[in-house]
Curated annotation (Swiss-Prot):
ATP binds at G10, P11, A12, S13, A14, G15, K16, S17, T18. InterPro entries: Cytidylate_kin, Cytidylate_kinase_dom, P-loop_NTPase. Its EC number is 2.7.4.25. It catalyses: CMP + ATP = CDP + ADP; dCMP + ATP = dCDP + ADP. The gene is cmk. GO terms for molecular function: ATP binding; CMP kinase activity; dCMP kinase activity. Keywords: ATP-binding, Cytoplasm, Kinase, Nucleotide-binding, Transferase. The lineage of its organism: Bacteria, Bacillati, Bacillota, Bacilli, Lactobacillales. Pfam families: Cytidylate_kin. One of its GO terms (biological process) is nucleobase-containing small molecule interconversion. This is Cytidylate kinase. It comes from the Bacteria.
Length: 224
């Protein structure tokens, strides 16, 4: 069987990464967290004292930035050059500025090429905002994952509490709404559902139920 490509897109905190990781393990595919790649570039800008809206300097930073994933339990580790930044890329500052960095054409072009290279050499589950529309337009299965703003804010709140971070629930709702607007209105590869993507609403659904539903869709599309 040739390499099989699964694209999972959707807004922030819809459950993409959680679902994609479990599916990749279940199917023995490579998990590609594209959001982590954009976060890593955003963090690299911070570490180099570059303003998040300085497109030219961030463009020049790309050639000096190696991003590496290493399998691990319970979470895949993310490396910026040789530094483990798995936790650091999830900080509030990176979260609130990654949309700006991800909107730059050169950043997207560079990372899309890296993502396609991985997909050309492996069967992958890739999640992000524009996988089915831009990165892997010929993906074998495309999923568009959604959930209500209230539910997504609750999920983010629980994640923050588990990390010892305290953020007001209403603030999280506003941040998610702002992120949705930025992601869906940017000029380059805006967040949008591919015409051939299957819509899966995770509101009120357990992780196991969503995984089972998508695994069934994938298995029905695999031709041996």
């Amino acid at each position: 069987m040739t390499n099989f490509q699964v694209a999972i897109d959707g807004p922030a905190s819809a459950g993409k990464s959680t679902i994609a990781k479990i599916l990749a393990t279940k199917l023995n595919y490579v998990y590609v967290d594209t959001g982590a790649m954009y976060r890593t570039i955003t963090l690299a800008a911070k570490k180099n004292g570059i303003a998040y809206n300085d497109e030219e300097k961030i463009k020049n930073l790309l050639s000096q930035t190696e991003i590496r994933f290493e399998p691990s339990t319970p979470v895949q580790r993310v490396f910026l050059n040789d530094t483990d930044v798995t936790e650091e890329i999830r900080s509030a500052e990176v979260t609130n500025n990654v949309s700006v960095v991800a909107s730059f054409a050169d950043v997207r072009s560079n990372l899309v090429n890296r993502q396609r290279e991985i997909a050309n050499n492996n069967s992958v589950i890739m999640d992000g905002r524009d996988i089915g529309t831009t990165v892997l337009p010929e993906a074998d299965v495309k999923i568009f994952l959604v959930a209500s703003v209230d539910e997504r804010a609750q999920r983010r709140y629980k994640e923050n509490v588990a990390k010892g971070m305290t953020t007001d629930l209403e603030t999280l709702k506003r941040e998610i709404e702002a992120r949705d607007y930025k992601d869906s209105h940017r000029q380059i590869s805006p967040l949008t559902q591919a015409k051939d993507a299957i819509l899966v609403d995770t509101t009120g659904q357990s992780i196991d139920d969503v995984v089972a539903k998508i695994a069934n869709i994938i298995e029905n599309n695999i031709s041996f």
